[in-house]
Amino acid sequence: MIEKKYIVALDQGTTSSRAIILDHDANIISISQREFTQIYPKPGWVEHDPMEIWATQSSTLVEVLAKADISSDQIAGIGITNQRETTIIWEKETGKPIYNAIVWQCRRTADACTKLKQKEGLEEYIRQNTGLVVDPYFSGTKVKWILDNVAGARERAEKGELLFGTVDTWLVWKMTQGRVHVTDFTNASRTMLFNIHNLEWDQHILDELQIPRSLLPSVHSSSEIYGQTNIGGKGGTRIPISGIAGDQQAALYGQLCVQPGMAKNTYGTGCFLLMNTGTDAVRSNHGLLTTIACGPRGEVNYALEGAVFVGGASIQWLRDELKLIADAADSEYFATKVKNSNGVYVVPAFTGLGAPYWDPYARGSIFGLTRGTNSNHIIRATLESIAYQTRDVLDAMQADAGTRLQALRVDGGAVANNFLMQFQSDILGTRVERPVVRESTALGAAFLAGLAVGYWKDLDEVKSKATIEKEFRPGIETTERNYKYNGWKKAVARAQDWEDKG
């Protein structure tokens, strides 16, 4: 029998699909990545083509094995991690999507959310049972929108002809040739349709949104065998799909934040801060979400989460729209060309503001411009906005959990930016720890998949794989920290409530 030497993580993100092969020591052996199209039909609307998601993800899986010259029978299991909340509805018979995937960033259901909030007691019911706030970010109103706006969709859904899934569900369904319709607890907890206390779909919310239960996948733990997939067609080896977690929960697990009070921030397209609260679903009084995280064996734990909609995307904006930089990495170079932002604050509320403000009507703004402002000040202020938004969330989190973080673990593309990491530590007054393996999201999916198939014995074995590459410590005084942060709060207050409401 051929030795099962490797684990594969499929990382289906907002802008690209990736496949990553890891060995027993959690070293990355090979990575394959393919970008796909971002579709913007109207201002504030964001879509993906589900078939393109599948095409890019399946081809990276074949590519990554070929690139590393590894045969599929050497793979012990596959873990899937995915952009969360993004909503796909397809025909059960043909596997054909009836509409594009509506992406988590899409704000088209803002008015539908306003209407839901007007129903007596419903907003509080949703908050209490799903841990979420009523917001276009989550899948629930996206599902309703597709059923209401695609001809014949509601009738077909009621006849049981259609299936709904977040991206993980769609990938597993495609990988198993339509045999398996599942999701995991972490992804289900982001739909605004799932009761995080009794771990079941919430019939009252389904009724309010007129969503037939037959659309929904069955819900499982994040670390178990859901089904098998063939790589390389009929002759290929059947490999267990044995781990699923939404990208932020996967990153929390990959950073081994499996004890209550441990927290991480992922700096991707958006920024996502999660703090593990163990078996206690802590309710937030500060505009944060209560969500499901992975416990030591992939079982249900809870976490507080704050989502910042625009993190690394603001650096892309500097590059693609403003043309101030040629490459994302240039932002660090130009930011350090000036000694401070010269009083400039950039509030990148391009699609509204997430936690702790939850204002879909806020818009992007630049404040504090003077005749002496140059492009380097704007670049620096844009990077600083990522750190300020992180502090907004972290302050709320510490207040809710009644604890002070000793350190923040960080991952995602923007953590390579040393200026940003140092400023993050400065503005938090907290240690920032950057791991050797930056791919925490893929690592989490790999750990969950590997534990389910016995590739790693237990979490203790896994823990020896995570080492800190660099620690950033605060380098400014409290007075300066507070002065800078107060300026940020003033800027945010002015950016809020800009767009006309419906």
Curated annotation (Swiss-Prot):
Its EC number is 2.7.1.30. Activity of this regulatory enzyme is affected by several metabolites. Allosterically and non-competitively inhibited by fructose 1,6-bisphosphate (FBP) and unphosphorylated phosphocarrier protein EIIA-Glc (III-Glc), an integral component of the bacterial phosphotransferase (PTS) system. GO terms for biological process: glycerol catabolic process; glycerol metabolic process; glycerol-3-phosphate metabolic process. Pathway: Polyol metabolism; glycerol degradation via glycerol kinase pathway; sn-glycerol 3-phosphate from glycerol: step 1/1. InterPro entries: ATPase_NBD, Carb_kinase_FGGY, Carb_kinase_FGGY_CS, FGGY_C, FGGY_N, Glycerol_kin. The keyword DNA repair does not apply. PROSITE patterns: FGGY_KINASES_1, FGGY_KINASES_2. It is an enzyme of class 2 (transferase). ADP binds at T14, R18, T269, G312, G413, N417. It catalyses: glycerol + ATP = sn-glycerol 3-phosphate + ADP + H(+). GO terms for molecular function: ATP binding; glycerol kinase activity; metal ion binding. ATP binds at T14, T15, S16, T269, G312, Q316, G413. This is Glycerol kinase. It comes from Photorhabdus laumondii subsp. laumondii (strain DSM 15139 / CIP 105565 / TT01). The gene is glpK.
